[in-house]
Amino acid sequence: MVGRLLRKVTLAGLACFLVSVGMSAWFVPARAQSSQSPQQNPSPPDDQTVIRVDVDLVNILFSVRTKKGQLIPNLNKEDFDLYEDGKKQEIQRFSRETDIPLTLGLLIDISASQENLIDIERNAASSFFASVIRPKDEAFLISFGKSTDLLQDYTNSPRLLMAGLKDLHADGGGPIMNPGAVPGIGKPKGTLLFDAVYLAATEKLRGEVGRKALVLITDGEDQGSYYTVKNAIEQAQKADTIVYSFYYVDPYFYSRYGGGFGGGGEGDLRKMSSETGGHVFTVDRKHTLQDVFKELQEELRNQYTLGYTPSNTARDGSYRKIEIKVKQPDMVVQARKGYYATKAGAQ
């Protein structure tokens, strides 16, 4: 069985694993209520608002940069062309990110290879939560190693998120370096990275509306996950969630145990991020974790959303490729590669 996403106080049910849902609406005035079990630390409810959800509307959250990497925040609907499976689509809704609520999950690797970095991660994440979470935003916190643990459920309180960060402790899992002549039995469990992304997408984000993002802090090494990187990407796409990866390696750990000077998981992080519209930030001596969090914060506040109704009206659950083209030269669009169409009969 796959490792479960555990709350520190109560177990989170997995009943929604195989439930198919339609497209979520982003252009709404308030955040929809989650279908999850009662929150560990509930936030005060907003005024009741009637929300109309258009299940056929496809929403895309994206960023635009110069070829040198600078964010471009002031483009308009007329600056873009949109294609689905090579066919041009009509952009029906367009907005620059200003007041659209953000739902964010921070997933932190606590395996042995990250043990020396946890204090740095705790401090940097605390500062990030304090500066980025606004009244209508919500965030949750998950640690992953030999298991996946929900340290703090949805809240818009930086104080509660910081309290959850205090529960970060290395759990001893991680890559086995220079194994001996006698192999272990079964698949060793040490860093359930793919499971953590899969569970966060299915349990926490699938039923949410608005802008959604997962932030991973890890060296990218997965060991023992039940799900594959492909499974993790698929569920993030179905949840309309962007994955941002912070590639953070402790070179001393790998040199000490004969693994060179870095983890080998950067490729999987790039797959997850590029396919969902995010990207990989590399942390090193010249580019600290604090620096990376500041860059992410800037990107989250300089995004665009667009919505369209596909010309392909088939409700077949198929994967469809998306391409957004910007008309100005020397600019690059950062967006997810595609989406899964609503399946007939899906709720």
Where do the protein language model's features map onto the residues?
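Bacterial N-terminal signal peptides that target proteins for export
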Residues: V2-W26
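Scaffold/interface architecture of coatomer-like assemblies
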Residues: A25-Q347
